[in-house]
């Protein structure tokens, strides 16, 4: 394994005794003998603590012709991350996620939950490949976080039901064929029984929340695992 750095370095003082140097370019190469197995590169990294701006491009290439690329751009008002996966230069899937921010509301005395709820105002996400697109928005992140933090439930099942209801109230996610623009299904949250057991005379049940695909044509419901299986949707997986 070899690591190289180049370009301008940004100094960040994390505390009175520690200074971190962030290089503009970093490349890590993994070799086995004379063969290059993989190369990870971080390029065009810019960081400005005073203006709260960050930008960087990350790429991972393997000798099997797989490439993963990520671009992150953060400012006081917006954070955007895009990612893509390619095989032999053919795009397999692309992801774009955006957050609307208000960095002026940052207060060092805030708890982590209050900090997140205060600076985030909305989010958008899209996942696209050559055939399918999943797009989602959550325009009231602050209200959603507060609603999740204030769930009052006496059992695990009641909590999961309430949690799913909050997600469904504040998030809008749909599926459509790439280039079509017409949603054929929505994505909703639903509670499910993860596992259960009995100990003596007491029975225990533990619930979680999962996304499910709800088709507009017949209101049928499928988990992501059920729908995106190799037998029924192999061409998308390929």
Language-model region placement:
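Long, acidic/polar, low-complexity amphipathic helices and coiled-coil-like
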Residues: 1-90
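Long, charge-rich C-terminal accessory regions
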Residues: 85, 91-202
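Acidic/polar residues at beta-strand termini and the immediately following turn/coil
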Residues: 75, 175-177, 215
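Solvent-exposed strand-loop boundary residues in beta-sheet-rich modules
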Residues: 34, 64, 89-91, 179-181, ...
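Short, surface-exposed secondary-structure junctions/capping segments
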Residues: 54-63, 85-87, 112-122, 205-212
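Intrinsically disordered, low-complexity regions
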Residues: 25, 117, 129, 141, ...
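N-terminal "mature head" segments of proteins
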Residues: 1-19, 185-238
